[in-house]
UniProtKB/Swiss-Prot annotation:
Record protein name field: Elongation factor 1-alpha 2
Keywords: Cytoplasm, Elongation factor, GTP-binding, Nucleotide-binding, Phosphoprotein, Protein biosynthesis
Chain residue ranges for the region called G3: 91-94
Organism classification: Eukaryota, Metazoa, Ecdysozoa, Nematoda, Chromadorea
Protein role: This protein promotes the GTP-dependent binding of aminoacyl-tRNA to the A-site of ribosomes during protein biosynthesis.
Record's GO cellular component terms: cytoplasm
Residues covered by the tr-type G domain: 5-242
Key word Chaperone present: no
Organism: Oscheius tipulae
Database matches in Pfam families: GTP-eEF1A_C, GTP_EFTU, GTP_EFTU_D2
CDD domains found in the cross-reference section: EF1_alpha, EF1_alpha_II, EF1_alpha_III
Gene: eft-2
């Protein structure tokens, strides 16, 4: 057995008809976890329904439909392999929870693949004021997806087909707008493809002999190649934040007979191990960790990404709950957030947001109403320039800096300190109306909390 490949997550973004499904379907189909039987079944159905031309998208639509209906389909279907990586597609933007998932960090993408359609008129529609191309790219940037690949799709439908002039025209335009939102075009591969016919997907295309390949320059090393698959292989794998102080947002707290209180959650940063003295915020309860378990096996130490249960001494189920954050009491312990400033993007709010608006925020596992206490400034979402300060209102499409005050105790962190605890979705009227990234937090000084005996002994 060789060394297991590194796992990376990608998110595929772009305008509604850019061909995301076909492109993604093609990768999964050719390099992925779908077995031949399933593919043949899908193909036969597609043929019978006269959808033969949608072969790859059809594969994806079937998966999506099953996922939408809540059938837990084999998750391997959303994975494929490159020479270096196991790649998981964490979400397709057509999926209604896409934005919420990106923010609440069920999924942090390592790289965004931006698909743009190159057909006559298609690119222009996607990148227009109302198109989703810019919005998705801005969202990826705001949520801290640092790497990007641009797939210039539908090269087979340019005039004339596979036109070099059209490709150049499009990448000039895309470079200009992604630069405005904060990406450096020199670090981004631009690949002309046909997701449907397979040009430059896995093998270099004979139809675009003019294309000399993509190349990127970055501090981790330069890279070049010809295909989309090679571009995916050049993603810089994420550094797991093991060396940061512990942050573990609780998903649940169980009371288990004969054992006691067992909080459960995913380690986001740092490590947790038996014997450690931990503090739960915002409750400010300090205690000792007796044992740490994953998949019913006890662990000497759990690391970022691990979903664990751990047993704590002398803490009742009433003391802590879902949304509490577990931290190392000796290393930058988590504290209650009295207020915080955030950059927000208003997505689909029917009216306008003004001071006093109090919707529910989903941040890590917490779900708590927070008041927009003050709108500090408005930012043009296309240029990132300040427009008017302080604005009276923010409406759909606006971005701004706001001050938020939780209505109940809450623990969040600045995005730059602890990214998974620094992104949030604003929920109202059963939908995501805005997303945000936390710039700074005013914390409670944390005096006068409950400390159990065993924790006090260890101090």
């Amino acid at each position: 057995m060789g060394k297991e490949k590194t796992h990376i997550n990608i998110v595929v973004i772009g305008h509604v008809d850019s061909g995301k499904s076909t492109t993604t379907g093609h990768l999964i189909y050719k390099c992925g976890g779908i077995d031949k039987r399933t593919i043949e079944k899908f193909e036969k159905e597609a043929q019978e329904m006269g959808k033969g031309s949608f072969k790859y998208a059809w594969v994806l639509d079937k998966l999506k439909a099953e996922r939408e209906r809540g059938i837990t389909i084999d998750i391997a279907l959303w994975k494929f392999e490159t020479a270096k990586f196991y790649v998981t597609i964490i979400d397709a933007p057509g999926h209604r929870d896409f934005i919420k998932n990106m923010i609440t960090g069920t999924s942090q993408a390592d790289c965004a693949v931006l698909v743009v359609a190159c057909g006559t008129g298609e690119f222009e529609a996607g990148i227009s004021k109302n198109g989703q191309t810019r919005e998705h790219a801005l969202l990826a940037q705001t949520l801290g997806v640092k790497q990007m690949i641009v797939a210039c799709n539908k090269m087979d439908s340019t005039e004339p087909p596979f036109s070099e002039k059209r490709f150049e025209e499009i990448i000039t335009e895309v470079k200009s707008f992604i630069k405005k939102i904060g990406y450096n075009p020199a670090t981004i591969p631009f690949v002309p493809i046909s997701g449907f016919n397979g040009d430059n997907m896995l093998e270099p295309s004979a139809n675009m002999s003019w294309y000399k390949g993509w190349s990127v320059e970055r501090k981790e090393g330069n890279a070049s190649g010809k295909t989309l698959l090679e571009a995916l292989d050049c993603i810089i794998p994420p550094q797991r934040p093991t060396d940061r102080p512990l942050r573990l947002p609780l998903q649940d707290v169980y009371k288990i007979g004969g054992i006691g209180t067992v909080p459960v959650g995913r380690v986001e940063t740092g490590v947790i191990k038996p014997g450690m003295v931990v503090t739960f915020a915002p409750q400010n309860v300090t205690t000792e960790v007796k044992s740490v378990e994953m998949h019913h096996e006890s662990l000497p130490e759990a690391q970022p990404g691990d979903n664990v249960g751990f047993n704590v001494k002398n803490v009742s189920v009433k003391d802590i709950r879902r949304g509490s954050v577990c931290s190392d009491s000796k290393n930058d312990p988590a504290k209650e957030s009295k207020s915080f400033t955030a950059q927000v993007i208003v997505m689909n709010h029917p009216g306008q947001i003004g001071a006093g608006y109090t919707p529910v925020l989903d941040c890590h596992t917490a779900h708590i109403a927070c008041k927009f206490a003050e709108l500090k400034e408005k930012v043009d979402r296309r240029t990132g320039k300040k427009v008017e300060d302080p604005p009276k209102f923010l409406k759909s499409g606006d971005a701004g800096i706001v001050e938020l005050i939780p209505t109940k105790p809450l623990c969040v962190e600045a995005f730059t300190d602890y990214a998974p605890l620094g992104r949030f979705a604003v929920r109202d009227m059963r939908q995501t109306v805005a997303v945000g990234v936390i710039k700074g937090v005013t914390k409670d000084d944390g005096s006068g909390g409950k400390v159990t005996k065993s924790a006090a002994k260890k101090k």
